[in-house]
């Protein structure tokens, strides 16, 4: 057995990140919603995340406290420089994982699977997955071979 085994919670504490998984979801969505206009509003954020506006308000206030957004009650939500950088990285992480799952031929809800994975993956593992996905994108013949392999195993592609 590998030395230094920890519970999931302890592994996540080691990352020394102030953002919870929920905060990451909110920050990623704020980034998505504000790419064109440089801001978003609580009602748009709440609708995009399928939460109630008071819940979105509480979370945005917490995020303002740690400096990733600027927000005044009933006003606009504007990402700070730090928030914009993190939001961009979170969206990139999401897209890499989603592309990876699609490449594998995951059936069902790729979005749901992506959400489950993205908050627990290390940056090193994400980098390796990004390289893997890029390698296969550059070799469509291998993707096709993989799809054939999956079909011969009786698995859907």
Predicted segments with their positions:
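Amphipathic alpha-helical segments within well-ordered protein domains
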Residues: 84, 98-102, 114-115
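Alpha-helical linker/hinge and terminal dimerization helices associated
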Residues: 93-101, 125, 136
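Basic, amphipathic "hinge/linker" alpha-helix immediately C-terminal to the N-terminal HTH DNA-binding motif
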Residues: 75-94
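N-terminal helix-turn-helix DNA-binding core of bacterial DNA-binding proteins
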Residues: 13-51
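Canonical helix-turn-helix DNA-binding module
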Residues: 42-77, 81
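C-terminal regulatory/oligomerization modules of transcriptional regulators
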Residues: 118-157
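N-terminal leader segment of winged-helix/HTH proteins
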Residues: 1-19, 157
